[in-house]
Amino acid sequence: MVECDYDPTEDATPAEVVEILGRTGMAGEVTQVKVRILEGPDKGRIITRNVKGPVREGDILLLRETEREARPIE
């Protein structure tokens, strides 16, 4: 077995889900949420992101980047 020193959470920024906006995707498999960035230069900023899988208010997500926002659901 090959060992790897890569840690996917190393570059991640924690963000707390503050509001669930709705479902999107062809079959509603993606949830659009507002998150508050908890660390880093964007700390305190609230952005909209799409999340795949179960999510609820208060959950902490680890974001690889905090620059990009999701387009609003129409």
Swiss-Prot record:
Gene3D superfamilies according to UniProt: Nucleic acid-binding proteins
Similarity annotation: Belongs to the eukaryotic ribosomal protein eS28 family.
GO biological process: maturation of SSU-rRNA; ribosomal small subunit assembly; translation
Protein name: Small ribosomal subunit protein eS28
GO molecular function: structural constituent of ribosome
Gene name tied to this protein: rps28e
One Pfam family here: Ribosomal_S28e
UniProt-listed CDD domains: S1_S28E (cd04457)
Species this chain originates from: Methanopyrus kandleri (strain AV19 / DSM 6324 / JCM 9639 / NBRC 100938)
Disulfide bonds: none
Alphabetically ordered keywords of this record: Ribonucleoprotein, Ribosomal protein
One term under GO cellular component: cytosolic small ribosomal subunit
This protein's record includes keyword Chloroplast: no
